[in-house]
Amino acid sequence: MRALWIVAVLLLGVEGSLVEFETLIMKIAGRSGVWYYSSYGCYCGTGGQGWPQDASDRCCFEHDCCYAKLTGCDPITDVYTYRQEDGEIVCGGEDPCGTQICECDKAAAICFRDSMDTYNHKYWRFSLENCQGESQPC
């Protein structure tokens, strides 16, 4: 619980896409990213190594890979805009970095929604000591 409190406090001062990512997860998956995914498996949260533990952890792995492909963008602080059209999230705006970050976040939120039935509470607050070995390539 302490770790979640720390994450929540840190997010209060964040002006960039971390807050937007949380909002997208809530809109698309209908659950809190901070609560369910800030410390899940080997890839959800800070860091990431080893192999994803399940489909939800793979969503975070793919999200990390998506961010890694961005050049000249800061997914932690860059702000983006999106809108809803007929129930769908549409990333947009004049900033190409913001649009790319939004697309990464949107894909992860959709992945979380689609893998909800495989979410396993044993991977929540999973010790990174269990995530040894080489990471899977993107």
UniProtKB/Swiss-Prot annotation:
This protein's record includes keyword Membrane: no
Cellular component annotations (GO), alphabetically ordered: extracellular region
Matching Gene3D superfamilies: Phospholipase A2 domain (1.20.90.10)
Signal peptide: 1-37
Similarity comment: Belongs to the phospholipase A2 family. Group II subfamily. D49 sub-subfamily.
Assembly mode: Heterodimer of an acidic subunit and a basic chain. The acidic subunit is non-toxic, without enzymatic activity and comprises 3 peptides that are cross-linked by 7 disulfide bridges. The basic subunit is toxic, has phospholipase A2 activity and is composed of a single chain.
Name of this chain's protein: Acidic phospholipase A2 homolog sistruxin A
Organism (species): Sistrurus tergeminus (Western massasauga)
